[in-house]
Amino acid sequence: MLPSQSPAIFTVSRLNQTVRLLLEHEMGQVWISGEISNFTQPASGHWYFTLKDDTAQVRCAMFRNSNRRVTFRPQHGQQVLVRANITLYEPRGDYQIIVESMQPAGEGLLQQKYEQLKAKLQAEGLFDQQYKKPLPSPAHCVGVITSKTGAALHDILHVLKRRDPSLPVIIYPTAVQGDDAPGQIVRAIELANQRNECDVLIVGRGGGSLEDLWSFNDERVARAIFASRIPVVSAVGHETDVTIADFVADLRAPTPSAAAEVVSRNQQELLRQVQSTRQRLEMAMDYYLANRTRRFTQIHHRLQQQHPQLRLARQQTMLERLQKRMSFALENQLKRTGQQQQRLTQRLNQQNPQPKIHRAQTRIQQLEYRLAETLRVQLSATRERFGNAVTHLEAVSPLSTLARGYSVTTATDGNVLKKVKQVKAGEMLTTRLEDGWIESEVKNIQPVKKSRKKVH
C-alpha cells in the first residue's frame, strides 16, 4: 500500500536541469586559480581545457567571443586565474565551468604586462637608437636616483670614490619598491632636470625578483626617462635582469657598480696619460733644443775656420793632447806597478799559515760549544721525560691510592671484594693498608639500598 504523500520522482532530464539551475543561481560567478592541462581548440574557435591543482580537477570551456579578449595563448602547465560560471552540461550530466575571462597568475601576469608594455613603447619608438643621448666625457657631476639605504647606492659611491674622488655626486633619494616607488622615481627624474645640477643620471637599484624590480617596468618611469634632457644610465638589478627602463635609457649598465664605472674617469689612468704626454713634450723640447744647438755649433765652427788664429789654436790643442797622453801613460805605468806590488803582497800573505790556524781554532771552539749545548739540551730533555714518567707512575700506583686513606680487601680465595654478597658471616678477610695488612673476621653483613630519584 503506497503512503498518502508519495515522494517527488525526477526524470533524468529534470534532475540534471534542477542541478544546473541550483549551481548557476546559488554559486554565480567565482574566481578560480589552477594549472591548465588538456588544452584544445577545435575549428569552432572555442577553448576546452582542464583546470587542476594537486588533488582535484574540473573541466572548463571558454567560448570564442570570450577567449578573443585574452591577450596571451594558454599553454599546458601554465598557472592562470579565471572568472567563470559553474554549470552542468545536461545531456551528459557533466559538471563544468564556463570561463568568462583569463589572465596569468603571479609572475606570469607580470611577465605578460611587461611584454605588452615593451611592445607598446617599442612601437612608439621610445627604444630607437636615434633618441639615445651621448654620455658626457668627462662627467662633471653625477646624479644618483635610488634608495638612500640600499646596497646599490653604497656600490656606486664606493666605485666613484675609488676611480674619481673629486667627481661631485648628488643623490636624489627615492623608494625603489612598492606602490609609491614609480611616482617617486618620476618626481626625482623631473627634479634633477629642473635643478640641472648634473650632466648624467644613474637610475637603478640592487637585484631582486620580478615583483621587486617592477617599479622600473612602470610606464610612467619609462616615459620620464625618455623625456629627461639629462642622459640616463639604467642600473637595475643584476646582469640577467632586464627592465623597460633599460630599453628606454640612453645606456644600460648590467649592475650599479658598472654604471659608476661608465660615468666616471679613472684618475690613475688620467695621471698616466698626463705623465706620458709630459714625457713626450719634454722629449720634443729636448730634441728641438739639441737640434738648434747643433746648428749653432756648425755655424760657429764655419766662422772659426776663417779665423787667422785657427792654426795656432790647433797646434796648441795638439800640444795639450800630447801632454795629456804622456801624463796618462805615466799614471797608467805607475798604477800597473802598484797593482803588481799589491798582488805580490797578497800572494805572500796567503802563504802565511797563521790565518789558517786562527780559523781552525775558531772552528774548533764553535764545534765544542755546539757539542756542549747539544749535550745540555738532550740531558735536560731526558731529565724532564724521566720526571714526567715518575710523576705518571706515582699517579697510577695503587700505593698512592692507599696513601690517600683507601684500602683493598680480599677474601680467603684472594679475590678483591667489591660487593657484600661475595662474603658470609664468619669468613676471614685480609685488608691491605698503606703500611701493612689486617686480618679480620666478618661479624655482620648489612647491604646498603640505593635510592632512585624520581624524574618529574
Curated annotation (Swiss-Prot):
Transmembrane segments: none annotated. GO terms for molecular function: exodeoxyribonuclease VII activity; nucleic acid binding. It comes from the Bacteria. Its main location: cytoplasm. CDD domains: ExoVII_LU_OBF. It is an enzyme of class 3 (hydrolase). GO terms for cellular component: cytoplasm; exodeoxyribonuclease VII complex. Signal peptide: none annotated. Disulfide bonds: none annotated. The keyword Oxidoreductase does not apply. It catalyses: Exonucleolytic cleavage in either 5'- to 3'- or 3'- to 5'-direction to yield nucleoside 5'-phosphates. Its EC number is 3.1.11.6. One of its GO terms (biological process) is DNA catabolic process. The keyword Heme does not apply. Belongs to the XseA family. Bidirectionally degrades single-stranded DNA into large acid-insoluble oligonucleotides, which are then degraded further into small acid-soluble oligonucleotides. This is Exodeoxyribonuclease 7 large subunit. It comes from Shigella boydii serotype 18 (strain CDC 3083-94 / BS512). The gene is xseA.
